[in-house]
A protein has these predicted regions:
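Conserved SAM-binding loop of SAM-dependent methyltransferases across substrates and taxa
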Residues: 1-10
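S-adenosyl-L-methionine
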Residues: 8, 14-55
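Active-site capping/gating segments
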Residues: 14, 18-19, 90-135
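Class I S-adenosyl-L-methionine
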Residues: 24-34, 95, 99, 162, ...
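Short loop/edge segments at beta-strand edges and connector loops
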Residues: 42-44, 87, 107
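Conserved beta-strand signature within the Rossmann-like core of class I S-adenosyl-L-methionine
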Residues: 78-94
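An accessory alpha-helical subdomain
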Residues: 133-202
């Protein structure tokens, strides 16, 4: 938010964290940059944020399941705010949770940082578009604003699912059967997505 404030792209910002350390560093960075319109709130998720004080919520740097939990505890954000979400892991759990939160994906962007691929989702209240098993992992092609990395995310999630499927197959536990079947369906769907994306199945 400091860069956005300095560039005049936002008027004010609220930074939250459940730990004092990151908030203290945020205050120090804001002071060093000469930024005054950044409020730092020690709280869990959005619990310490006034619903009337923000119109855009950014949640980044954590797993998709944790982002979903934060939104579930802040229904006002789901109703009224534009939410920019960047899951560090388990994006499929976040995408799967959005319909129950009354949120629809407006757009997605893929970015690569330090060799890793990340999805950034812009979501807002609305009727969600149905996603296939594979799209829960990779995103829907028609929603991705820049498709240059879409082939890479398909390959990455395909490999991730292959490793997970092999692990569950080796375990042979009956309790893993439902999970294994779900992963197989997602893997098959991603394989089909790759064929459609490349056009020739390569």
């Amino acid at each position: 938010p400091i860069r956005l404030l300095l560039d005049g792209k936002i008027q004010s910002a609220v930074a939250t964290d459940i730990r004092p350390g990151p908030l203290s560093r945020a205050k120090e960075n804001a002071y060093a940059a000469g930024v005054q319109d950044l409020s730092c709130v020690l709280c869990d998720g959005l619990t310490g944020v006034s619903p009337d004080s923000v119109d855009t919520v950014v949640i980044a740097g954590m797993g998709g399941e944790n982002i979903a939990a934060i939104l579930r505890a802040a229904p006002w954000a789901c109703r009224n705010a534009l939410c920019i979400l960047q899951p560090m892991s388990r994006p499929e759990e976040l995408r799967a949770a959005l319909p129950s939160l009354g949120l629809m994906i407006r757009a997605e962007r893929l970015v690569r940082d330090a060799g890793r691929l990340y999805s950034i989702l812009a979501v807002r209240a609305g009727a969600p578009e149905a996603l296939s098993a594979g799209e829960l992992y990779c995103g829907k092609y028609s929603l991705v604003s820049d498709d240059t990395l879409f082939s890479d995310i398909l390959a990455e999630q395909d490999k991730r699912l292959d490793i997970a499927v092999r692990g569950l197959e080796r375990s042979g536990r009956e309790c893993d059967r439902e999970r294994l079947n779900a992963l197989r369906r997602a893997a098959a769907n991603i394989a089909e997505m790759r064929r459609k994306y490349h056009g020739d199945g390569s």
